[in-house]
Amino acid sequence: MQVRRESGPRYAAMSDTGGRERNEDAYFTGRVNGYHVFAVADGLGGHACGEVASRMAVEILEETAGEELPATGPAEVLERAFERINAAIFDYNRENSLNAGTTLSAVIVGESGRCWIGTVGDSRTHIVTPSSVWHTRDQSYVQGLVASGVISPAEAMLHPRKNVLTQALGLAARVQVDLDEQELAGGVLVISSDGLHDYVPESVIREIVTANDPDTACRRLIAAARDAASTDNTTVIVARA
């Protein structure tokens, strides 16, 4: 558990191995050159490959943000970071005959509360208010079914192919990064790996994060994932202004 109680956004982060032998998730939280940077990565590939890939993702993100901010705009920093991460993992795979990959949802938050968000795969960023939940769109097979109206979000949580991704970092020479901009504006920022949002409904996530401080919210979200029979690694960051 990581908790910040100083000036600026109050945030906490927590990662749980769940029913797995190892934790292939990684996360980053920190202040970088006047911005707050948050990220969750969920590694793929097994046999420690995913653990390596997710760690590479958050380390290269931190390094790129430190080098580029504030001279370069946050959206462009995210684009460059994702390109570097993808290239680094792709090269690592070629050199070692591996198939490591990772998801990544990364957020750069400015002093005004504006959030720049980059996502590959199905790790997810949410902006939660007492009455609504906005979240990034998963790059996954079932998200395509939801978007086309074939199944509902509730049905997607039970779909047998819910873990099939259409994009991941490190598995191809090029990757499509989804970029978004949102205002935090009194809401709560929640970034999670799919061990949370594949098992815990949005209504429960909203109830927990709007009623609790970030530290307590993280603990209760992890507990909710376990109660929902999540056997996956689960990582969550909760931040509020």
Where are these regions (language model features)?
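PP2C/PPM-type serine/threonine phosphatase catalytic domain
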Residues: 1-241
